[in-house]
Design a protein with these regions (language model features):
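Structured alpha-helical
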Residues: 1-118
Length: 118
């Protein structure tokens, strides 16, 4: 089975502005970082971060276009490249409406879409 077939919701490759708030894994200080997405889905996003975070850490994602806030959990931290790392964030609950995009994939709105294991 293809990996995309196993996903809970389709990923969209898109650069959207985003604000991330949380606690820095480096010095335990609170951070607020303006950044952008690489991919989004109904279940989270892949973003670029300068601040250091840890797997499992809870952070807040803020959509600056409407000030909507969602809590998420860090599910992936890539290697640091030029001071930035790719960070995967999973919403605690699916939130397809968070992204405010015009043409969301059909599986973002299927009943039970958030129920599978991936």
């Amino acid at each position: 089975m293809e990996e995309d077939d196993q996903r809970r919701s389709e990923r969209i490759l898109i650069d959207l502005p985003l604000v991330v708030r949380g606690e820095s894994a480096k010095d335990n200080g609170i951070f607020r970082e303006e950044t952008f997405t690489l991919t989004i889905s109904a279940h989270g996003a892949l973003v670029m971060l300068e601040n250091k975070v840890s797997l499992g850490q809870k952070i807040i994602l803020v959509n600056p276009t409407n000030s909507d806030e969602r809590e998420g959990k860090v599910s992936y931290v890539g290697p640091d490249r030029a001071g930035l790392a790719k960070v995967g964030v999973e919403f605690l609950r699916p939130a397809p409406e968070f992204w405010q995009i015009g043409s969301a994939p059909p599986n973002w709105h299927l009943p039970g879409a958030g129920q599978s294991s991936r």
